[in-house]
Amino acid sequence: MRHTALPRVRSIGAARAASTAAPAPGAARSTAATGGGAAGGPRHVGRRIAVLAACGVLAVGCAEAGTAGTDSAGGNGGASSPVKVGLLYSKTGPLAAYGKQYLEGFKAGLDYATKGTGKVDGHPIEFVEQDDAGDPAKAVSGAKELIGKGYKILAGSTASGVALQVAPFAAQNKVLFISGPAAADKVTALNKYTFRSGRQSYQDTLTAASFVGDAKGRKVTVLAQDSAFGQANVAAVKAVLGKEGATVDAVLAPPSATDLTPFATQAKAAKPDLLFVAWAGETASALWTSLNQQDVFSSTRVVTGLDLAASYPLFGPAGEKISFLNHYFAGAAGTDIEKAMTEAVAKGGGKPDIFTPDGFTAAQMVVHAVEANKGSADDTAALVKALEGWSFDGVKGHLTVRAEDHALLQPMFQVRLTGSGAAAKPTVEKVLPSEQVAPPVLAMVG
């Protein structure tokens, strides 16, 4: 059977040999902070960051024609019938660099979780790639195509806007959906069919809060752009640190501002105990230069998020003076599973980055759910039951799928950069245990 709206079916064996999409030039994202860039140059870097910021992280179908596979995708059609998984992710578009990381992680995780066989109880795990290009409408259209073909498991979502549209659709059709790098807190507890394989914004904010210690009586200033992205960061910091007794104010710059010295001066004059920087756009490098020139780092602790490796040069000489919160960077965890992931990704010519673990974890979750149901994905309620409350060892350490709301409890990192430019390298200063950065339990919405 052939269907041009679907990408080529891939088993784990085929996945190892398949090439993956190269990151979009300059693709980068801001994780509660400034973003980064790739080889596209400063102008391209800035444009990419601006688009990525609009997707909101603390605040993220060009389908390939091919064989669609069997009409029954659940895996109960015989002893060796395949279990089909639909990957909805950004193969192209502004988040393509993250999509590439996710896909590489998923392949490595599938290989690891099935012990190199690509099978669960004799059933091959096959996946198809559906490119959403970061567009919620394309993602929903792709999900509709896959569900119409009988797919019971969907995974992916690089962008929060995509996840928030696909999740309700999956629930309506009683399909398991494992969201990926999309960080929006609203994905947690959205419905009983939706899980996540990455971290969420609240975990970012709690990691930032860890630099303050006891927040009571402390002053925190958020330096951000006066945009939806910046205001969302201000709201998040107030929700976490304000609740703990800190006084939170903000210095907001117009997104069009190019002379950032006045705002760096205002931030210094506020005399905060902690300056939280949430910035995105082509002025990111200029911002860090202004903060450095105004000697802000000598008067307060400055905290921001560390994004993908291509973004490190943006911080310039200021990089060594910043306290970074971080979800993951290559080598951060030091676990045996991280080593296995790194080796598997390297065999395909890649290198792990910030969202490679999200794909790896998604594959672990898929395999566990199918294993618990003896190689079948037909009973979605049973898949959900298998994942709720599951604790397991992952790339970052020990992870738990919280039963009440499907939050993924996981360690987070305090990080420092040493060196600047192309020589900038991150090191872990402190590993924050999952319980320290656990978001509050939410009531399930649907």
How should each PLM-predicted stretch be described?
Residues 69-109, 117, 130-137, 159-161, ...:
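Extracytoplasmic "Venus flytrap"
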Residues 70-72, 98-102, 112, 116-188, ...:
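Beta-alpha junction/loop-to-helix N-cap segments that form part of ligand/metal-binding clefts
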Residues 58-61:
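C-terminal motif of bacterial Sec signal peptides marking the signal peptidase cleavage site
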Residues 394-446:
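Solvent-exposed, acidic/polar segments of extracytosolic/periplasmic ligand-binding ectodomains
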Residues 63-66:
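Bacterial signal peptide processing site
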Residues 141, 184-186, 192-294, 331-339:
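Extracellular/periplasmic Venus flytrap/periplasmic-binding protein
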Residues 87, 146-158, 178-180, 219-224, ...:
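Periplasmic-binding protein-like
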Residues 290-360, 371-374, 432-445:
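Extracellular/periplasmic periplasmic-binding protein-like sensory domains
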